[in-house]
Amino acid sequence: GGIVIVPKENDIMEFTPVQYPADRSEGDTITTHFDFHAMDDRLVKLDILGHDDPTVLRMLKDITGLDPQTIPLDDPETMKIFRTSEPLGVTLDELDCDVGSIAIPEFGTTFVRQMLKDTRPTTMEELLRISGLSHGTDVWLGNAQELVLSGTATLSQVICTRDDIMNYLILRGGDPSMSFKTMESVRKGRGLTPEMEEHMRSIDTPQWFIDSCKKIKYMFPRAHAAAYVMMAFRVAYYKVHMPLAFYSVYYTVRADAFDIAQAEGGAQKVLANINAIKKKGNDADKKEEDLLTILEVVFEMNKRGIELLPVDLYKSKASQFIIEDGKIRPPFSSVAGV
């Protein structure tokens, strides 16, 4: 989350009123009343992000004995799930999904799954570019997506990460310093100055490229996208080749959102619960949205032939999903209210 830093000699109330999440004044967490953009000229904010993925990989290593660092990043079956669900041996038409990236970090959301449908990536480079597109603001929707679908440009040509702008302009013979300044201006959402646009035209930069730069509000760095893709590919390898370990670890890390009453009963019952939440649309609360993500994974798992066992007083763990006879045994924490 975002952490606002207040100088020792100041009080937060000099800058903004504060409030307690859910009006729980006895809690330790307070939030600023104003959006940070109202204060960003006065206070420093740190974005301290939590990542489950390193924990997931460590748990997968402990269960399978396979070191994620040794996973080949060119495994063909793993690469396939980013464009089809065929390596999983199932179809997911009921979820309006024809790729196998559900539950894969950075590639499992509805938004990115649609990107995968539109682009059908076949290489690590294309996955990296999709990661850059999905983490930017106004980079894909209303911008690169239209260019790709219209045939104006391909995925390999559109602007995906901030580095693409500088490298592209330099390769066309542009001035390195001006190319760098152009990249910095665009990635911060400041658009192009007349000088930058004139420089781009002097090296015959296509009009669609210039127009694309003007729409962008924020751009992801290429190295960051590469780190995300490598992590995602390693997790995906376990999903394809070691599904029992993958699903048990996925649920364990997200046990707080798991509800065994909604997840048991087989694929058709789970699908009915998925559709019930979807029907609520914007009326679905955060807990239901988190549960929907879990249920999609359970549905896919059931279609792959892996069942959820009932919670057992003598066999279930407190909070860890365990593998048992080719099936998965939920913990006590998966029971609502426990």
Where are each of the predicted segments found?
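Noncatalytic, beta-rich nucleic-acid-contacting surfaces in large DNA/RNA-processing enzymes
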Residues: G1-V338
